């Protein structure tokens, strides 16, 4: 069920670079917008978007069998 998938996702997240992991966690698990993340972490909005996009594409390759 969903719980197992969530645990699996957390395991996969653990393999991401730490700066990507923080952004994915804030964006998807804590519900912050990209703009909020940019302000909180004091990094440019473009950087937030680029890192999240990179992280998600890497996650996809890890998740695919």
For the regions a protein language model found, what residue spans apply to each?
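Short, locally clustered residues in the helix-turn-helix/winged-helix DNA-binding domain
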Residues: 13-14, 28, 60
């Amino acid at each position: 069920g969903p719980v197992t998938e969530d645990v699996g996702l957390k395991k996969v997240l653990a393999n991401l670079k730490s700066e990507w992991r923080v952004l994915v966690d804030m964006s998807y698990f804590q519900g912050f917008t990209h703009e909020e993340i940019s302000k909180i972490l004091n990094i440019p909005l473009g950087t937030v978007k680029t890192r999240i996009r990179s992280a998600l594409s890497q996650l996809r390759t890890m998740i695919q069998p």
